[in-house]
Every structure is written in C-alpha cells, then in structure tokens.
Amino acid sequence: MASRPVVITGLGVICAIGRDPTEFWLRLMSGQGGVTPVDDEAFAVFTARYAGQVPAGWIAEQLADADADLDRTAQLALIAARQAVGQAGLSADDVEADRFGLVLGKCQATPDAAGRYQPMHRTGDVVAGRLGMRGPRILVSTACAAGGNAVGLAKDKILTGEADVVLAGGVDPLLFGTYAGFAGLQALSTGPCAPYSRSDGLNLGEGAAFLLLEPLDRALARGATPLAEVAGYGLSADAYHATAPDPTGRGGASAVRRALADAGMSTDDVSYVSGHGTGTPANDAMEAKVMRAVFGDRAPRVPTSSIKSFVGHTLGAAGAVEAVASVLALQHGMAPPTIGFDTDSVTDLDFVPNVARRMPIETVVSNNYAFGGNNVALALTVPGGEREYEEFPDRPVVISGLGPVSGLGTGIAELAEAIAEGRQAVGRSPSLEGRTFAPRSLWRHMNHLSRMAIAASRLAWEDAGIKLPRAALDNVGLIFATAAGSVESTGGFDESVAVDPNKPAVLSFSNVVLNATGGAVCQTLGLRGPTTTICNGEASASIALDCAVEMIRAGKADVVLVVAADEATATAAAGTTITPYDRDRTGEAPGSAAVAILVESAEHCAERGGRAYARILGTGHAGTAEQDERESIRRSLAGLPAEGAGLVVGAGTGGRYDADEASVLLELVPDGLLTTSVGQTGDCQAASGAMNLAVAALAIRDGIAPALHGLERPYAGEVESYVRKPHLSEAVGQALVLTAAAGSVRGAVLLGAMA
C-alpha cells in the first residue's frame, strides 16, 4: 500500500518572465523569453552580460509599505510565498501556526540592506514571521538543486506528521560576486543561452517560487483544489567533482530512479521531463546520458525541455521555478519549449524545440543538478482521488559511530579524555597537522572546513566499525549541516573579486556554495546515496539528524552519515573561559569544529554486529522569534517524553538566552542534570549542536559528561542541578539534547540507552 498522498494546492512565482503564475505560464506558452542584457552598469566589466532579471517595478507593486525595508532576497521570497498561500485559499483557521512548516532552498548567502552577509536562514525567518508560521523550518542549501530538494523534504514533514501544511520553495537574487564566479569559470554565454543545442554557456537569473503542500485528504476536507501530487522524490550524490557533473550521468540517473521508486512508478509512466538544461556543454551532454540510461530505447520519445532558456539559471530557486512549470504543464496538458534551440543540431532526443506542445501529460519528472554533486528528481502527477494508505513506518534508529574534531582533540577517545579531565579549548582551532584523511592530490587543495569534515567522517566510520562493499556505498546517505560554510573560501573569493572581478579565485568560488563540503565528503568516501545540506545556524545538526532518521524510516537508506562543521569568523582571546548558565561568567566565544555521527537502522547495526551508543527516541523542532524563546523550547519538547531524562545537554553558549533555557529545562525536566559542550569548545555553531549530540551519546554509553567548571551562581535552580563532575554518579537511561538558532529554530533530540 502506498504512503499518504501529498498534493500541491498553491503556486507562487516571480522571475524574469512573470510576476505571478498566470503571467509566467503565458510567457512560457508564447515562447517569449526574459533573458536580456544586464541593466546594472557594474556588470559592464564582463564580456558576457545577459541574465534573467526581475524588474524592480514588479517587486514594488506587490509589497506593502511594511516590507519596503526588507532586502531584495526576502522581498522576492515573500511575494512568491504569499501567492502560493493565496491560491491555496489557506486561512489562519485552516492550519495551526505550530503545524505550518517552511522548507526554503537557497544557493547563496545574500546581503542585507546594508550589504552585510545575513545568516542563510534569515530569508526563511522573514517569510515565516510575516505569514505566521511556527512549525518545522528548514533552510536547505544544495546549491542549484535546493529548490527541488525543498519540495521533497516538505513532503517528508507531512508524512512523518510533524506538519499539516508545508510551504516549499527557493529563492536567489542576481549577485555581482556570483556572476563574477561563473564568468571566471567561463561558464556564461555571451547571448541568450541555448540548452541542448548550441550549449555554449548559461545565463544567470533571479527569482523565487513556492509550492504549498498538504495531505490530499486534508486538502479535500477544507475544499481546496489539488493541482498536482508529489508522488515521489529522489536525492543522490555524484561523488565526482566540486563543480563538474559526473559525465557518465550515474548520479542524475540514480536520482530519477529513486524518485520513481518512491512513487511506485516505472519509466513507462513518465510523460514529460523538465530538464535542468543549463546550456553548458558538460551539463547538457550529461543530461542526454541520464535520459538514455533511465529510459533506454524509449528516451527519444520522452519530451524534455529546459525553461532556463526563458529565465536563466535562478540557482537556489531553479528547482522550485521548474516545479511550478511542471505543475502547470500537468494542469494544461502542454509541454513548455526549449527556446533558442538550433534545429540544425544533431540529436536523437526530443527537446521540444522552440514551440510549446499540446500533449497528454500524466506524470512529470523534474530534474536538478548542482555544484558539489547534488542531484534531485521530483515525480509529479495528476492528482488522484482519496485512497487508503499506510502510516509512515516506525523503524528503530541508533547512533553507532562518533567522529569529533575540535580543539579538544581528534576522535572519540581524545574527546572522552578531555571531558574526563575537564580540559578547555575555547578558541583553539582543531589541528590536523601531519594527518591526511583523503588522497593527497585532493587533500592539499582542500580548505580547512572540508578537511575537518572529512576527518570527522572517517573517524565516525572507523568508530562504528562499519565495513561495506563498494556497491553498498551507493545507498549510504550523507547530510551535511553548517551555519556558514567555509569562511576561508568565502573570504578568499570576495577579496579576489574586489581586486579584479574578471580574475576571481575560481577554486575558492567552487567552495563558496555551502554544500561543497558535503560534496567533498561524498567524493572522498565514495558515498552516492541520498544527500542534502542543512543551513539553519546552530540548529542545523539536530535538523540534519531528523532528516537522517526520516531517510532510514522511509527505507531510503540503512546508513546515513550526519556531518556538522563550522569555523569561527573571529578568534577568541587566548585563555578565554566561559561558563554557560552562570550569571557572573557570561560571554560568548567562537570556536571551530566538525563532528560526524553515524546513524543506522537498529536492525542493520545488529546484523553487522555493531555496538551502538544510543537509540534515537524522538526529535522535535519549532520555529521561533527572538521574543519567543521560552515558549519555543516548550513547543520543541511538546511531542517528546523527556521529563524522565537523567541528563540534559543544552544549547547554552554563555549568551543572553541561557537564562531562558535553564529556567524552562529545569522546570520541564526536573531530574535531569544540565550541561553543555560549549563551555569546553566555544560556540562552534552547527558543530556545537552535533557535539552536544555526541557527548549525550557518550554519556549514555560511558557515563561521562562535560562538567560546568566555575558554576557558582546559576540563572535558575541550584548548582546541584548542573553537571559539576565529569564522571556521572548514576547511569543515564535517557538524555535530552537541545539546539538553538536564535530567532529561527529551536530543536530537541531525545536519546535512550540500548536495551
């Protein structure tokens, strides 16, 4: 029996060919593209100056006065989000705020009104705040695959019961630095691009698109009109190269096959393919191989087109924009054309050249590929009627390997020793001198973040004692979690663009996308399973773990590697000490770390004779605002039986939210001793969340936990309510772990001892 049907009931889009779905579709059908010369004088330094731009007037006419101070990225996203909610006819009475989720795809860190980089999740926080959404909130950053990836993760949130309605989409503006990077790679066409024929380069674009997802039965009950069904989705990793796609098409083909398997369909069911179609020689040649590999002899009879020929490459928005086009194709029975197609090109495939085609369309596969080797495929179908379905499976999941890399040491043995001795390493960067965790030809060209993440991944794999044949690695998942990606690469690239935009540091550019480090891990370890990257600040690791559990429960993988890594943007003074939760020892200190956690089904771990640290009993996440932190902690814990936890590893950083957290936790978990890893490592952003998960698992198995040395005047409770000595006097049956991205997401994970 199939899983619960999830449908799309609302669409929103703003891009170079339309300020809403109606105008967007009319332009697609008329063959009227929106790629034009860039109207910003700053871009005159480039030889290739064509892009898909959104007129400023289109933005201004759809915004309220209260939105005028928002940055351009947030404005684009808010316009498309409101359109999708409006078309779905969704009101505040139709969904509880706590059950209304958001999954947003972005490729680039975007500037605020003052030109400073914002946290990646900031755009999603703005959209959620303006629309009153307090449910699960995820920022996915798998570069140019992010928009499609977001739709798949949104479906998961509905199937697991975490949300009743989820808004999924993508957004990215046209940025000078990104343009310089693609120009430096010589990937831009000097005129409007011609995917699948001339293939002489791509055009960049900008825009936003959203799709509103909800269960079919719920949509019909409230009188909504289903526009399409999200029948399935597939993710994969190329494990091949930082920027170039695997020329064999293996990764892209794997994503399509996984999407169809998820949907319970065969290749014969596919009517039309919405291709990635960037117009670069490498991409277009690879996609042709994907078509032939997936569809075999039928490939020439499966119409495939690229709407990037209309709008340019909208990066993180591309998958969502193309998903909107796919839904409209299903509705109208029309395949959008590939415009600019040179009909003299020799090809056996049907790329719907230049003119839209009326045809029966029951199922669309929408494909996207990205730097870092991320691939995603969506299987969208004409919605069916209500039918019986199976509940989301409940497979037990365990943590079986830990790989910490921080100033405290490298590997679980060194971390355990540092905790037992009470050592502090605030501000101390991990040292990997003299150690190589990848082939030297790769290792010497890697930035520090990738080296840390790869080292952590290898160590977790070794700690788990897992040995799999090469073929099995195709089904091992990888979820990378980071707040900011590589500071080293971003800084180096920005500096090079400032000196000469025509000579950017292209090696740094390939590592500016936040999923690049996850791609490097996949390439080094040979992992080609379902892969994604989560960028929700300090809450990223718990969200990544949540996604890993969902993959395993759904049967999409038996083993998933969760890797979190961040490096400090500033350096803490030598000898800096902080004591979280103490009134007199406040102050935040940055740190750098990477932590890998190997997660697998309990059955798989037992069959191979593995020794797990802990069971994952449950997770919870709640969207929040800075003025709502206490209530958000309560909401993140609402579905977890955490009151009996013997240990609580909090998100405390020594900052202004420690008092709120301590007060609520001591109230809700009165018998749990409170601690955090941050006092010993500094605030390592996403890696601190993963470190907290690691020390909780270590406490359950080995009975040690970070002691809060120097704690004398806690914000809440008595000192006896906190961990004061690393060797715990009682065995820990359950441990609660908190993560927090202030003003964005609060997360909670409950771990339990192995039976």
Q: How should these model regions be labeled?
A:
Residues 1-8, 92-97, 265-269, 295-300, ...:
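Flexible, low-complexity linker/loop segments at domain and module junctions
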Residues 1-4, 36-79, 106-153, 162, ...:
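Conserved catalytic cysteine-centered active-site region
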Residues 5-9, 32-37, 192-263, 272, ...:
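Condensing-enzyme catalytic core mediating Claisen C-C bond formation in acyl metabolism
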Residues 37, 152, 156, 160, ...:
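Glycine-/small-residue-rich "gating" segment that lines the acyl/pantetheine channel
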